[in-house]
Regions:
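N-terminal positively charged helical leader segments and presequences
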Residues: 1-100
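RNA substrate-binding interface of SAM-dependent RNA methyltransferases
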Residues: 39, 47-49, 61, 102-190
Length: 190
C-alpha cells in the first residue's frame, strides 16, 4: 500500500469486495490499487486464505484481522463474505462538486436514475466505459448499490470507470445545466 492510498481511502473513493475468490483475483490484478485486506480471526490457515495473505504481503497491502461481527460491518454481507473483505481504490470515483471545480470538465456524461437491477447497472457501466463516456452520474438513492453483482456484470470495468457520485440525479443535472451542460433525457415511459 502506498502512502498516497493511505491518505486517499474513504468508502466513496472505492469499493469493498468480499469473498475469497474475488479478493484473490483482485489482489492478483496488478492494475488495481488495494487499500486494505480484512480477514476474520476465525479463518483457518491454508488453501486460498494462505494464497490471499501471501499475495497481499507480496503487494505490500495492509492486512487487518477482525472478529466475525466487525468483518460483517465492513463487508455488509455476513452471509457471503467467507471471512474476507478487500478495499479497492477506484481512481475514477469522484464527487460531483470536485468535477465541477476542476479546470477540465468532462465532455460527455451519462446519468443513471431508477435502475434497481444490479446486473443492468453493471452492463450499463461496462458499455459506458467501452463507449468512452467521460463520467457516469451515480446518485446515492434510487439505484442499485455498487456491490458484487454490479462489479460482476461490469466485468471489472467499474474499478476504472469514471463514476461521479451525486446526491440525486435531478440536483446533479440542475448543477450541470447551471455550468453550461446540455441535457438530453431518455425515458422508457414517455
Amino acid at each position: 500500500m502506498t502512502e498516497d492510498s493511505k491518505r486517499r481511502w474513504h468508502p466513496s473513493a472505492g469499493l469493498t469486495l468480499f469473498g475469497r475468490k474475488p479478493a484473490l483475483e483482485a489482489l492478483m490484478d496488478p492494475l488495481l490499487e488495494i487499500h486494505c485486506l480484512h480477514l476474520a480471526n476465525s479463518n483457518r490457515s491454508g488453501g486460498i486464505i494462505t494464497q490471499i495473505m501471501t499475495e497481499a504481503e507480496r503487494r505490500g497491502v495492509e492486512t487487518r484481522f477482525h472478529d466475525r461481527q466487525a468483518l460483517s460491518r465492513i463487508s455488509k454481507n455476513w452471509r457471503q463474505d467467507q471471512g474476507v473483505a478487500l478495499d479497492v481504490i477506484c481512481p475514477g470515483f469522484q464527487a460531483l462538486d470536485a468535477v465541477l471545480a476542476s479546470s477540465t470538465l468532462p465532455r460527455s456524461l451519462l446519468a443513471l436514475d431508477g435502475i434497481t437491477n444490479p446486473q443492468n447497472v453493471g452492463m450499463i457501466i461496462r458499455s459506458a466505459v467501452a463507449a468512452g463516456i467521460d463520467g457516469i452520474l451515480y446518485p446515492q438513492r434510487g439505484i442499485a448499490s455498487l456491490g458484487p453483482l454490479v462489479i460482476k456484470a461490469s466485468a471489472g470495468t467499474i474499478f476504472r470507470a469514471p463514476i461521479i457520485h451525486c446526491d440525486t440525479t435531478l440536483s446533479a443535472l440542475s448543477s450541470l445545466k447551471a455550468n453550461g451542460f446540455h441535457v438530453a433525457i431518455l425515458d422508457a415511459h414517455a
